[in-house]
Amino acid sequence: MPSQTLKIENARYVVTLDVERRIIRDGSILVEGRRIRRVGKAAELAGTPADRVIDAHHLVVTPGFVNGHMHISYAHAVRGIFPDDLGSPLGHVFRLQMAMTEEEEYYTTLLGLVELLRNGTVCFVDPGSTKHPDACLQAYEDAGIRVILGECVSDREAPFPLPRHGTEEAIARTASFLEKWDGRLEGRLRAWAMPFSPETCSADLLRGVKRVADERGTGLTLHHNSGPEARRESLVRHGLRPTEHLESIGVLGPNVLLSHALGLDEAEIECLARTGTAVAMCPVTAAKGGRGVAEHGRMPELLARGVRVALGCDSPNNSNHLDLVRTMNMAAIQYKDARRDMRQIPAERALEMATLMGAQALGLGDEQGSVAPGKRADLVLFDTRRPEWQALFNPVNNLVYNADGRSVHTVIVDGRVVVDAYRQSFVDEDRLFARVQEIGERLLVRTGVTLPGSRWPIV
């Protein structure tokens, strides 16, 4: 049976992210099966037949977004419960997460997938927070999204209820997870090694799971260096900065993605550049959490040294949204203010981090991240018939500085339309919203988690 064809016809702009970074006015795209076959001016593809044609005269097309650090699991059920003066929420996070049943995690994951797709994310890394992957597999399959999963492992005591195992058991569990999950859903699901952090994992564990990832040709991600406190602790414990410590034990490299990476200094940036290690930065989480981005953030220096940087939304209770357009905006503006230099992180670079560079950080740059023949057909179509898109002269500026995910009109993953004219068809949203509200209410009662409510009276 021949592959189905899809034509996106006469787009107002196609922002390709190809080698030349072309923006094609009045562009068309031909998709055959799961891949892009042709990209060019509408006149060049005029008359080319397709099984389905999308009239895109009012749409701006970009590559699908890549979310490099996104805890998909529990948080939708209890979103917004953490007050501004809580401090670290991690104790509550793991208490709530570990209490979730398979059914509860399935529905909260499903809601997360709805939000990701409706905001243009086609691929994300869940850094080990999914407790019941067997239960969530159907949600990933129905949604049609790309996902990178792993089992969170640690072998040291943590100041919060993190799952802990013996070193050899943790390595074996990682190997078993990769064997079971990597490559499922016709390749849309990848499995990585996911030690939680250098503070909660011994050097033997980190070396062991890195070896497993290398042997299987897959990746490794971990939370890393989330501020100057982590640097001080590492200097006391190892006599080395956190990134230098990872390099010294052989746990850096092109298949490693360090998440957050906020408290880096010049020596650590050099480690990352020298080893080809990538980072996933969560600018909204960092700003909302008061992490001192203006003082400790080093995104411009990382980019200047050629380090691959992905963007992440982190969690619905950290950034509190799963909208990479808003995340791009934060990445583009916060360093302009911090450095008092409007040239920092231009809009084009922010879009690169959410698309092509983000895919490269995940080792997927050959397959996705740009609108080019041979690439996977992962595309987002933005509706310019909205006030925030007016007037339109520079589509990248309008996207990064004007818009947000609410203008996502259509999303295509692997050649399949998964959001069609603002609507997804894999779940009844009203019923899902009601179900997740009930789950959250039950979860808070069951765990005994109580936090201050609204500062203003609810009457």
Regions found by a protein language model. Give the residues of each.
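His/Asp/Glu-enriched, well-ordered alpha-helical/loop segment
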Residues: 248-255, 300-386, 402-404
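Active-site gating loops and adjacent loop-to-helix segments of metal-dependent hydrolytic enzymes
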Residues: 76-107, 148-171, 228-255, 275-278, ...
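Active-site microenvironment of metallo-dependent hydrolases
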Residues: 1-27, 32-37, 42, 352-459
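Histidine/acidic-residue-rich catalytic or RNA/ligand-binding cores of hydrolases
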Residues: 228-240, 268-274, 290-302, 317-336, ...
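Metal-coordinating catalytic core of metallo-dependent amide/deamination hydrolases
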Residues: 136-269
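Glycine-enriched alpha-helix->loop->beta-strand junction motifs that scaffold or abut catalytic
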Residues: 144-146, 214-219, 251-254, 271-280, ...
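Alpha-helical scaffold segments that flank or form the walls of functional sites
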Residues: 78-145, 170-184, 437-445
